[in-house]
Amino acid sequence: MPNWCSTSLEIETGTEMLAKKVSDKIESWCHECGVENGFGDSWLGNIAVNSNAFPMYSDVSCRGTLEDVWAEGTKVHCIVYSAWEPQLGAIVRGVNHAFPEKTFEYHYDAEEPGCCFYCTNRSELVGQYHVDTCGIENEALLEQIGDGQYDADRKWLTGILQKFYRSHESLEILIDRVAEEEGVCITFWEYEPIDSYIE
């Protein structure tokens, strides 16, 4: 049984009208079940088949589903759940195939907390630490860190953990200590080009 990776994909189209067209096109690929499967109409394989971007759906990784798609301004937003890692090939190559005369910018961030896997091609997230406070029972630590999931810069996180542990240890040592003593996952967003996930 895989761990599930949640990926937020943002497609910059340049115009609101084109964003609406792209969003509608992606949605239309999910209305028809191109291949029998256990995921339903929103299976990534249906997108691969119905977009006509692939001779066979097996030519692309598609173990997952498109959970949501919407246009907002000049951008199209997609939420994808997939096994272990991002699987964006069906959508990205499908859109490029459907709109060959257009050039799009693709930005994504993906998280699979079970394996502390966080990757992105967004420069503003790279190097930020993702703090997952789910399950922290230590009230004093929760008070310092705050409740919820969020991204934090190195300086802030170092200050909070050094204050909590009354220590001047390095951030890496403190993160290991928090994981061991509190079961908290703190890891940083790594840069990974989108090409790594559209094969």
Residue ranges and their predicted role:
Residues 1-199:
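Long, contiguous binding/interaction regions
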